[in-house]
Amino acid sequence: MERRVVKPPGQDMVVERLKSRYGLAGRCPVEENDMTGVWAALMNQQHELSDFDQTKYKRRIVTSPDGLDTYSSGDKVGSSPRYYSDGRNHPTPPFCSSFKHLNVNCLDDELDSFHDLKKWETEKELMEDDHRDGASKITKQSFKEMETDALMTSMASGLETECCSGSIDSPLKQAVYPRPKVSKKQGLLPHEINQIYDELYHIHMKLQYETTAQKKFAEELQKREQFLAEREQLLFSHETALSKIKGVKEEVLTRFQILKEQHGTEIEHLTEALKEKNKENKRMRSSFDTLRELNDNLRKQLNEVSEENKKMEIQAKRVQARLDNLQRKYEFMTVQRLKGDSHAAHEVKSSKQEKAPAPKPFKAALNGQVYELLTVFMDWISDCHLSKVEPEEPGVDGGKPPAKPSQRSDIQEKCVKLLPMMTEQLQWMPLVSAKLHEPFVRFIYWSLRQLDASARQSTMASTLRRLGEDVFKGVTMKGTQDNSLEHSVENKAKTAVFFKSSSLPLRFLSTLIVLRTVTQADYLAQAFDSLCLDLKTDEGKTLFLEYQAIPVILKHLRISSKGLLSNVIDSLLQMTVESKSLQPFLEACSNSLFFRTCSVLLRTPKLDLHILEKLSIILQKLSKIKSNKKLFEVFTIHLMLQEIQRTTHPEHAFLCINLNSTLFNLGLTKCNSLVTSTSH
């Protein structure tokens, strides 16, 4: 059994095969004198092969793909490729070192050559098995060429195989068999050297291919290293971003927790506020129920009062009927008395013939006690019914609730019927005691005030004008008759004065009646002058408030009465003087009628400066009442005052001071050094 060559660790199969084939596998002890002949023979053969054309073998290597596949797919070369690449550049030293251990035993016998050839074929089969185990096969064409070459050098290859196999199998074999001397004539054939070169060239090509592959692999490694560096940098950036995101996440969670706590706190506050609102709603509901009960009670009381009022009206009608009956009875008794007196009857007839109103004064002279009774009734009616004048806009002054429209209409109808009769009765007043004039005039005044909002006063224009003239001028009567004397009547002129009376209450009432009924400018001017004089006294101010004279005055506070405008303002200005009547007067002016009149007046372009200054004093005092701020805003008086303040020349310091004070009281401007309180 043939011994196989054992490869050292890291050796390539092809290199081992060459070493085992050409005797390079082990060290064979050869003497120096034997190697001298071998070396000389090798040098001669190398010189003879120097001119050998290697192009043929290179072309065969290139055109033989099986051979390239064999060496390219063979085992990896460890340390031997470097050795053979050096041998390619310097071919002489490897051959010398290889053949130091070569034992050439040439036999001339032909049979030994064939025997050795048979061994070489056996060895070739073993080597093919080795190549199959290493995953690289030699093509059939290569083995055929090698077999052809082996036939030419069968002797040399057989000897080399024996020598190498012996040296590899056992080093003791060399000692048993003596080394035969090498014949100087025996040497290596050129074909074997070419085959060695061919093998070395294949190794060289394989090394170059591996070098190129390693360079490419190195470049790929460099690129991959660069790619990994970029990925590492990207990973670092991602890690940094993740750390930032982690910090942001913690901050967001903290902020979310804070917001959650704030939300919970707000919910608690809102819940408490809702509970308070619910409690307040319950209280308001209970208050509303209470108010509703009170309203029901008031409605019941109103119904009761209405029933009582109806009863009082029925009673008043009965009293009026009784009064009429008494008057008829008195007239009947007077007529009976006149029938008993012939002289009186003759005078009555003569008076009828002359169509003179003699019976009236005659009647008046005889009815003094009746007039006293009538004045009592007039005072009672005036105080209980007529003096309760309804405002033109109900509910503005915040006073008592207005009467029913039907009741007010009834009162106005009665006043319309009474005024013509009262105007006729003025002609008797000279025959009546002066103390009865005031109740009579008061009754006329309150009857006129009841007609302020009536639409029928236009139909009574002539009656009102006559009434005003009689009150202004007075009434004079010449013929009188004294009932107490039973002798002839003496003619004596008597006069009843009202407007020019020395009694302040009568004069004040007469002035108001003149202002209410007269349209002549000269009469009105005298009436306002008299009113201003009367208002300088405390009694006059008291009467002004008692008779509610503001609506009468406001009817003349308009631009159409341009000549009387200053007198009207003066009369109102007298009421603004510091006194006990100032505050009631300001409260009486705190209504929509007064503010509407002032608003219309302030809108007048180019209003006289003196009138504006006087009006500003009144408005300044009214602005001190907080409840009047709404009236200032409703009628936009505050805006007009601001515009007047903006356009007023600084030289008019008095007006500027009043305007600034008024606006300051309304909270529309800041206090400055110019604002001072006026005492006018």
Curated annotation (Swiss-Prot):
Alphabetized UniProt keyword annotations: Coiled coil, Phosphoprotein
Keyword Manganese appears in the UniProt entry: no
Q: What InterPro entries does its record include?
A: CCDC138, CCDC138_C, CCDC138_cc
Q: Which residues form a coiled coil?
A: 260-339
- What residue spans carry the region label Disordered? 390-410
Domain of life of the organism encoding this protein: Eukaryota
- Spell out which residues are annotated as carrying Phosphoserine: S64, S484
Q: Which residues carry this modification: Phosphothreonine?
A: T63
State the PANTHER family in the record. COILED-COIL DOMAIN-CONTAINING PROTEIN 138
This chain belongs to the protein called: Coiled-coil domain-containing protein 138
**Species of origin:** Mus musculus (Mouse)
